[in-house]
């Protein structure tokens, strides 16, 4: 089962990476929807990373650091793309997605 979670995690990384470097057509009709999407994407990404490693994510500092570094690198790459822009609030939304998962996951796991 861990192999499936790892595959889903890898596919999510590829999808998020592709979406991060692809030009955006027009503006969003809903204000701040991009921040919500950043939050949800990293919440789900953190969930699948947690399922795909043997240790709980809170104990795996390396995995957590990699997620945060990945979020930062996406914004760094976007800074250098003429058709995208790097935003601190996008990075903060990514971090909030990670942190919300880390906060609620242990509570949900122990209740299940």
Residue positions per predicted region:
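Short helix-capping/hinge motifs at transmembrane helix termini and TM-loop junctions
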Residues: 22-23, 54, 82-83
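Membrane-interfacial alpha-helical segments at the cytosolic side of multi-pass membrane proteins
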Residues: 41-55, 97-109
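Membrane-embedded alpha-helical segments that form the functional core of polytopic membrane enzymes
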Residues: 57-72
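"…centered on the first transmembrane helix and the immediately adjacent amphipathic helix/loop
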Residues: 1-51, 63, 67
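Residues within alpha-helical transmembrane segments of multi-pass membrane proteins, especially transporters
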Residues: 48, 52, 69, 73, ...
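Terminal transmembrane helix and immediately flanking juxtamembrane interfaces
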Residues: 1-22, 89-112
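Interfacial helix-loop-helix junctions of multi-pass membrane proteins
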Residues: 29-35, 76-96
């Amino acid at each position: 089962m861990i192999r499936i979670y790892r595959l889903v995690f890898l596919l999510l990384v590829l999808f998020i990476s592709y979406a991060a470097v692809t030009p955006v057509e027009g503006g969003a009709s809903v204000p701040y929807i991009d921040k919500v999407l950043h939050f949800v994407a990293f919440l789900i990404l953190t969930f699948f990373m947690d399922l795909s490693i043997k240790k709980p994510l809170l104990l795996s500092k390396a995995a957590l650091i990699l997620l945060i570094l990945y979020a930062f690198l996406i914004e760094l790459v976007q800074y250098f793309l003429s058709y995208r822009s790097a935003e601190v609030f996008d990075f903060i939304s990514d971090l909030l997605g990670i942190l919300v998962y880390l906060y609620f996951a242990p509570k949900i796991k122990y209740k299940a």
